[in-house]
Amino acid sequence: MEVTCLLLLALIPFHCRGQGVYAPAQAQIVHAGQACVVKEDNISERVYTIRESDTLVLQCLVTGHPRPQVRWTKTAGSASDKFQETSVFNETLRIERIARTQGGRYYCKAENGVGVPAIKSIRVDVQYLDEPVLTVHQTVSDVRGNFYQEKTVFLRCTVSSNPPARFIWKRGSDTLSHSQDNGVDIYEPLYTQGETKVLKLKNLRPQDYASYTCQVSVRNVCGIPDKSITFQLTNTTAPPTLKLSVNETLVVNPGENVTVQCLLTGGDPLPQLHWSHGPGPLPLGALAQGGTLSIPSVQARDSGYYNCTATNNVGNPAKKTVNLLVRSLKNATFQITPDMIKESENIQLGQDLKLSCHVDAVPQEKVNYQWFKNGKPARTSKRLLVTRNDPELPAVTSSLELIDLHFSDYGTYLCVASFPGSPVPDLSVEVNISSETVPPTISVPKGRAVVTVREGSPAELQCEVRGKPRPPVLWSRVDKEAALLPSGLALEETPDGKLRVERVSREMSGTYRCQTARYNGFNVRAREAQVQLTVHFPPEVEPSSQDVRQALGRPVLLRCSLLRGSPQRIASAVWRFKGQLLPPPPVLPAAAAEGPDHAELRLDALTRDSSGNYECSVSNDVGSATCLFQVSAKAYSPEFYFDTPNPTRSHKLSKNYSYVLQWTQREPDAVDPVLNYRLSIRQLNQHNAMVKAIPVRRVEKGQLLEYTLTDLRVPHSYEIHLTPYTTFGAGDMASRVIHYTEPINSPSLSDNTCHFEDEKICGYTQDLTDNFDWTRQNALTQNPKRSPNTGPPTDISGTPEGYYMFIETSRPRELGDRARLVSPLYNASAKFYCVSFFYHMYGKHIGSLNLLVRSRNKGTLDTHAWSLSGNKGNVWQQAHVPINPSGPFQIIFEGVRGSGYLGDIAIDDVTLKKGECPRRQMDPNKVVVMPGSGAPRLSSLQLWGSMTIFLLALQR
């Protein structure tokens, strides 16, 4: 009994256990773009080298079931300064005109929810070579007690490149080398990484005055040509020198026209002049021509530093700077400071009092202040002092100090700021001192401590200030660190104490501080108050949309949960079915008392009539949000299996092919059992589709279903639609496009013949060591001027669309030239193999057709297995060649050119299979019809089912 059970368990197919054919994702990165070099010697460090501005194409080839989703990400490379990430959800990553900053490591992440994701990477190295920059530096040193001077010249050549460039120095047309003579030295400076080379000319001699060329090269990597730069060294070579037509600080009035000239006083070669402005660009309307800068009708915003720079690549650039100051007065403020020694915050007779006045002026130190009392100039005395630049106040501030305040000191004080002799208008500020002048207080109006508004509405926060004079109110956030006000400022001034917001958002909720300013009022400790802003916003729910599947007759529970909202509670929940209002479901008393955070609807048994769209509208008295449920007993979509090995079976003689379509059913137990599938097949660019019904038995999770599509035309592609059907009706459809691909010749498949219909020619490659290549063609692609009386008119099938491989022996081919076509590498798993193929050898100059076996067991060894020479007639003939490889091997078709141009040789329909060759030649005109499949096959299901019945009968 135990033995029988063990046998039964062993016969159960693997895919029927656990997850079936579900498999975790696997990935491999291949390149398909304009790569220069792809180094793959070290698998852990694959490097893809590409030239800048070329097109990068990387493909992530994935396997696994269900079909994995692919995501590309990138980390920084050598040419990038910081981490970067870009996500591309596609199996092919394509970057047009790649830049050097896009180099780095690219990761392909494939995941399908089974197991762990597969992650592969490749490093992209972007190659480039910029134009070199050559600068000249000179030093002069005294030698032997000032009897004569030695002049040394350094020619510094710098270039940005990847890989590091090689430098070649030339004097005229002669190449210079390190220590070529006592006057030449070539070296790399410290703290450089190969991007700089210096040519040092010591104790300059007459022959050193010449033309010098710095040539940089990356050794033609990626086809990047060399670049060079030339400099003519003479005895007059000198760095630039400058002088300005104005002083370095230029003060002007607004509205004036400003002209500054930057004059060259030296430099050979002739330097180039350039004007710049900091901060920002030159003002609008400014004109820089050579060394002349003109600014018409200058304004205060045009103030700043203007730089004139001269460069001629000799020495350091010469630079002169003009600080342009346009006179202006703005932002007049005052401060009332009670007696600081007595730490008083009020004005009291008998104590000191200070009045301060400040304006923002350009230039600040040139502003002049005047004080007036009751309209008359204030006269200084022992009790009235006027000071400037108080260290406790902003720079260039004027203060009027009243010592031992008397009643007679009460009055109106006026501070006037001006630029004497300038058309800039004066700026003044007035301060009233009396017994009613009191420090400020601040408070929040009654009922305004908490402001509640809806999101998107305007809001107004208010603080009331009392006192004389009333200072401005400053607003800031309290509860959030580094949080900004709605205006984007950290601190905002309001003259009336009201902070206004046009449209509030939920992020603006929180506590706001209002405080008195210490200017335009008393210079005392700031008074503060706080206002709470509460923003109500509609609820957010989950799921916003959910697909609910259940078998007919089973119960269904729908739940709509509140994620967030203000207020955070459900005030009401309304359910609708297909737009019709449903009676409210019962609510538990506990949930009603606490305020529920979700709404539920229960269906006792799902029926066709109760299938459809359900909506739950949740409200919190501010707004509402909706959960949408699509409830049905529809079957989920099939999951196509993309990892079928060699799904294409071609039948060359009938010009048809078949395709093995495989799939699994997603979550088959979630709904009623699948009864059958409806298959729709449509040839691309055609309108008519063929529909077939595919009956199935009980489908298990992970079970691989299979159906063979027959009578497909080579080389057309087809669109496939597959729909499952249950007792409920049609389920979700899955679609894909299948393409005809020539199967790769594999010895494990006896019916796998290479017909050369696909451009990939079954993985065959041209040998790089031969004289010329095999050519793939058919009757439609033949050269109309081809040589007559040689070569086949069509392939073995006799149709003009069929392809074959041949050698063209016309000029410039010569006697004995060889063309070799090499198969993929096969792993030997049998002792004997048979190579079958058709050949066509017609023409009076036919050479030889050889079949070789390349063994890769210990090294590489080519062995002749078959050979044929001479004219064999204008017919296709078949050959069967037995081979006995001792290890991994390849087969090679070698065509040898004969004595003339009438010697074209062709091959077609190559088959490699295990076992001995047939004793009788197959009729080449016989058409073999491959068997189609009219019903799906449940892989291995029928086999182990029959075996189980047999074992049970045996046990009895």
From Swiss-Prot:
Quote the residue positions with lipidation, kind GPI-anchor amidated serine: S933
Domain MAM spans what residues?
Answer: 752-919
Keywords of the record, alphabetical order, are:
Cell membrane, Developmental protein, Differentiation, Disulfide bond, Glycoprotein, GPI-anchor, Immunoglobulin domain, Lipoprotein, Membrane, Neurogenesis, Repeat, Signal
Biological processes, Gene Ontology terms: brain development; cerebral cortex radially oriented cell migration; inhibitory synapse assembly; negative regulation of synapse assembly; neuron migration; presynapse assembly; regulation of presynapse assembly; regulation of synapse maturation
Question: PROSITE patterns this protein is in?
Answer: FN3, IG_LIKE, MAM_2
Q: Which SMART domains match?
A: IG, IGc2, MAM
Propeptide ranges are: 934-956
Q: Which residues are glycosylated?
A: N42, N235, N257, N307
Could you say which residues form the signal peptide?
1-18
* Tissue specificity as recorded in UniProt: High levels detected in developing central and peripheral nervous systems with little expression elsewhere. In brain, highest levels in cerebral cortex and hindbrain at E15. At postnatal day 1, highest levels in basilar pons and superficial layers of the neocortex. In the developing spinal cord, restricted to a subpopulation of neurons in the dorsal and spinal ventral cord, probably D1 interneurons. Expressed in brain.
| Ig-like domain boundaries | 24-123, 132-230, 240-323, 338-432, 440-534, 539-632
Disulfide pairs? C60-C108, C157-C214, C262-C308, C357-C415, C463-C514, C560-C616
Q: What is its main location?
A: membrane
Fibronectin type-III domain sequence ranges: 644-744
**Which InterPro entries does this one have?**
Cell_Adh-Cytoskel_Orgn, ConA-like_dom_sf, FN3_dom, FN3_sf, Ig-like_dom, Ig-like_dom_sf, Ig-like_fold, Ig_I-set
Keyword Cell wall biogenesis/degradation attributed: no
- Work out whether the entry's keyword set contains Glycoprotein: yes
Q: Outline the segment boundaries, as ranges, of region: Disordered.
A: 780-799
**What are the Polar residues biased-composition ranges?**
780-789
Gene Ontology cellular component?
A: axon; cell surface; dendrite; GABA-ergic synapse; glutamatergic synapse; Golgi apparatus; plasma membrane; postsynaptic density membrane
Assembly behavior: Interacts heterophilically through its MAM domain with proteins in axon-rich regions and through its Ig-like domains with proteins in differentiating muscle. Interacts (through the Ig-like domains) with NLGN2.
Q: What does this protein do?
A: Required for radial migration of cortical neurons in the superficial layer of the neocortex. Plays a role in the formation or maintenance of inhibitory synapses. May function by inhibiting the activity of NLGN2.
Q: What is this protein called?
A: MAM domain-containing glycosylphosphatidylinositol anchor protein 1
Q: Which organism is it from?
A: Rattus norvegicus
**What gene codes for this chain?**
Mdga1
